[in-house]
Amino acid sequence: MVKLFCSIVGVAGSPFSVEVNEGKTVDDLKKAIKAENLDDPTLRNVAPKNLQLFLAKKGDAWLRYNEDLDTYLQSEIDTSSYLHMRASWKLSKPTLFGPDVSLGEDVVHVLVVVPGQRLPIAATAIHEPHPARKKRWEELNKILDRNQRAKVNAAGESSTGYSYVSFSDVDRVMRARRYEQPRKVIENEKIDVLYEYLLLLTKAFGEIVNGKEAKRLYFIVPVLVCVCGLFDGEVRILAEETVTGKRVHGDGAFEFVIERGSKRVCIVKAKRDDFQQGLAQAYVGSEVLADLEGLTDLFSIVTNFKEWYFSRCLNDRVERDDATMDMEHDIPTREAVKKIAEKIYSMLS
């Protein structure tokens, strides 16, 4: 069991503790918070799923539980400076309350935002998108609602799967401008290790481009892992991640989501080399993630290993770059591997 101290944003004198098994999820923590506060009018009529939780930590420092806490809770707290805790995350996640994380003393671990609570403007800013992005969501929702093949969850909320939305529809709302994704230099020794492993995979699996589509993922993953390993444990790769929007009436599915702090890189494998559908999937999913986590800048990659499309979904625009993994006799060149890896490294830096 782990004991966590929580505070409600906007409410003075609100710190309280909850005990929950570290093997549980953030969703379970929401239920424990509600159960601990059945007599509290602030939480009495709120469904646990509607609570928004933020890790009360900046760098290695927890929020101090001292005489200044009440004043801080009622000030204009910018929750975007804290990590938004997604419901599906395990509490044992290294970036949350994993075994190597010190919980400290006289600190607050979780900030709770209650829907409908009168909060200072900055505390609610994460929930109100930029005007340009809000307009994009409204236009996107018209398409999603029109093409709706509803998936209904236990709360009776429905969303539209990305597979029911065409690229041409999404492109009308999220037309991408050209940009050049920068590169950040990776040491030759690291590239050599990655390249040697890819050569080993080529010997084991045979043809990449003309071979079976399913095996391409085995070539994509080492590139991602190599780059993520450069950050000394600061980066996590979430596999087969699915998200469902609240204000965006769609859902997204990614082969991987790479996380580093507030940065997100969403990875989509282009199925049957259909890059347009892959881009539609990535763009809808990115907006859903922006909706859920209050993010303003998201990266996505759509690839079949040979072709790579890099995109940025910003508040006021969408940008896209593309690059080719050059091949010689169906074997990637070292320079091409270096180019792709360094673009991804720059995204996460």
UniProtKB/Swiss-Prot annotation:
Belongs to the Crinkler effector family. It comes from the Eukaryota. This is Crinkler effector protein 5. The gene is CRN5. One of its GO terms (cellular component) is host cell nucleus. Residues 58-108 are annotated as: DWL domain. Secreted effector that elicits necrosis in host plants, a characteristic of plant innate immunity. Keywords: Host nucleus, Secreted, Signal, Virulence. A motif (HVLVXXP motif) lies at residues 109-115. InterPro entries: Crinkler_N. Its main location: secreted. The CRN proteins have modular architectures that include a signal peptide, a conserved N-terminus, and highly diverse C-terminal domains. The conserved CRN N-terminus harbors a distinct LXLFLAK motif, which is followed by the conserved DWL domain. A highly conserved HVLVXXP motif marks the end of the CRN N-terminal domains and forms a junction where diverse C-terminal domains are fused. The conserved CRN N-terminus mediates the translocation into the plant host cells. Residues 18-57 are annotated as: LQLFLAK domain. Residues 1-17 form the signal peptide. It is found in: Secreted; Host nucleus.
